[in-house]
Amino acid sequence: MTFYYIRILRLQEKLEESFKYALRVVFTITSDLGEVSYPQDATVRVEALDRQQSHSRITISKQCVSWIGNGHAAETTLYFPASHQQIQLTLHLENQNSIVDSIHINADTVLPVWSEAFSPKSTLPNMVWRYIQGPEKKSPNDGLWFLEQMGNSIAKHLWDAGVVFSKKILSDDWHYSFSNRKDINVLELGSGCGIVGISIASKYPRALVSMTDTEDAIEFMEKNVEKNKSAMSNNITSDILVWGHDIPRKFRRHWDYIVMSDVMYNESSFSDLEASLQELMDKNTKLYIAYKKRHDNEKTFMSNILGWLDLVYEERGPITIYILQKK
């Protein structure tokens, strides 16, 4: 299983005539950290949608663009009347429905992308959206939306382990089923965009979910909470928690579950993360770790925590998931 992400790299507009608007769209298809380009030839459908009415998606311009395998970028220009007031771009593979197929986890899955809505002749968007369908699969609105930074940077993007772990949580796989009793407490460490915590809160409305990260991630996380509030029951919070420092009093409580995905990319933080886990966990806490192998030093972290944690369950693959408890 390999994930690739269509990423909008640049938007450039010009008014060709008083009534005609042209928008240049430059995009790429890469892995989550941008280190590998999509290796297959493909056709990407680039569409401009009229979003004047919030629930309508009327295509006003479209182009099919050839992507050359292992390429760096591709581009096209869309033309449409300048009279449209709310425009949204969507990019997806030509053989892929822009909503439905984005949620299937198959080999070489390419995730579509949506821009934020914008008005022609105004400031162009610098954020985009990703879509994860919910468990009911009844309609295109049955799902979760996650904001990302436009471009090909590492920060403020969904990473593979979070996408896979969220899909596991939203599925019927009993290994990833949490207790449905009232007021279970779930803590997420290194929440990033919030995909895992929001997925848990949407599936378990009786749970109390606390997402945490450093200060610079909180605003982004809260935007995703706001976007998905209709899928939750006001049962989620976002807070600053710095690993290795004194744990604030509000976190000194029993946690039924602690979850984290793709947090083992920085070896210098391993000792602080382990120290925080030792302080936050008790005998009845289950710890879920989802990660994509990137460095051999991840084995060192796992070896250290297995000195005081028991391995309850392990799922190996491109994304490895561990479930652990205190000895």
UniProtKB/Swiss-Prot annotation:
CDD domains: AdoMet_MTases
Database matches in Gene3D superfamilies: Vaccinia Virus protein VP39 (3.40.50.150)
InterPro entries registered for this protein in UniProt: Methyltransf_16, SAM-dependent_MTases_sf
GO molecular function: protein methyltransferase activity; protein-lysine N-methyltransferase activity
GO BP, sorted A to Z: cytoplasmic translational elongation
Protein name: UPF0665 family protein C23C4.06c
Annotated organism of origin: Schizosaccharomyces pombe (strain 972 / ATCC 24843) (Fission yeast)
Keywords tagged on the record: Cytoplasm, Nucleus
Family: Belongs to the UPF0665 family.
Gene Ontology CC terms: cytosol; nucleus; protein-containing complex
Organism ancestry: Eukaryota, Fungi, Dikarya, Ascomycota, Taphrinomycotina
UniProt-annotated location(s): Cytoplasm; Nucleus
Major localization listed first in the record, in broad terms: cytoplasm
Disulfide bonds: none
